[in-house]
Amino acid sequence: MKWSEVFHDITTRHDFQAMHDFLEKEYTTQIVYPDKKNIYQAFDLTPFEDIKVVILGQDPYHGPNQAHGLAFSVQPHAKFPPSLRNMYQELENDIGCHRTSPHLQDWAREGVLLLNTVLTVRQGEAHSHRNIGWETFTDEIIQAVSNYREHVVFILWGRPAQQKERFIDTSKHLIIKSPHPSPLSAFRGFFGSKPYSTTNNYLKSKGKTPVQWCES
């Protein structure tokens, strides 16, 4: 199965015209992130048949030169967001690799679907595009990955992500849960949770190639 088939299935069962119209107006009259051409970049960089890991975020970063369509990732020369810095600290503690770029395209190309549950946001207004239809779309994406792929690791950081557990078949996938890597919660159990090594150990146990989390 390919993303085109997944999207066709979703759009035949749900009407996204109101969301489409809303976004057309928003992109015309407001500053919206990411750039329109990057809204679906997570799907462009991670083919459906290559998915090994899903990391769920919430909505895109709402500052300039940050969001580019991948959850938690920012553009190459942007300042490190605090959550990403904590993700990298845990990466170093977990498997000993030090990353210097805030850009996660290499993870996406390794089969890590970096999926926000809302794919657009107005500049400076966090959560401004909630409840326009994105949640329906991304819930269906999670369900499709669960239904049609085997032995995927779903990494759910924080309560909003963990509410999506109901869409995942735990008999054939691994779910890794911990507090969110944001500074507000990282010390409540994110640090020390070892999501990267746990993911790779599971993938290897299923005969899959582990993720190259470190910069090559």
Curated annotation (Swiss-Prot):
Keyword Thylakoid listed: no
Residues at the catalytic site: D59
Localization: Cytoplasm
InterPro entries to which the protein is assigned, alphabetical: UDG_fam1, Ura-DNA_Glyclase_AS, Uracil-DNA_glycosylase-like, Uracil-DNA_glycosylase-like_sf
Gene3D superfamilies: Uracil-DNA glycosylase-like domain
Keyword Ribonucleoprotein: no
Domain of life: Bacteria
GO MF terms held by the record: uracil DNA N-glycosylase activity
Principal location listed in the UniProt entry: cytoplasm
Keywords: Cytoplasm, DNA damage, DNA repair, Hydrolase
Reaction catalysed by this enzyme: Hydrolyzes single-stranded DNA or mismatched double-stranded DNA and polynucleotides, releasing free uracil
The enzyme's E.C. designation: 3.2.2.27
Gene Ontology terms describing biological process: base-excision repair, AP site formation via deaminated base removal
Annotated Gene Ontology cellular component terms: cytoplasm
SUPFAM superfamilies: Uracil-DNA glycosylase-like
Alphabetized PANTHER family for the sequence: URACIL-DNA GLYCOSYLASE
HAMAP family linked to this entry: UDG (MF_00148)
Family of this protein: Belongs to the uracil-DNA glycosylase (UDG) superfamily. UNG family.
Purpose of the protein: Excises uracil residues from the DNA which can arise as a result of misincorporation of dUMP residues by DNA polymerase or due to deamination of cytosine.
Protein name: Uracil-DNA glycosylase
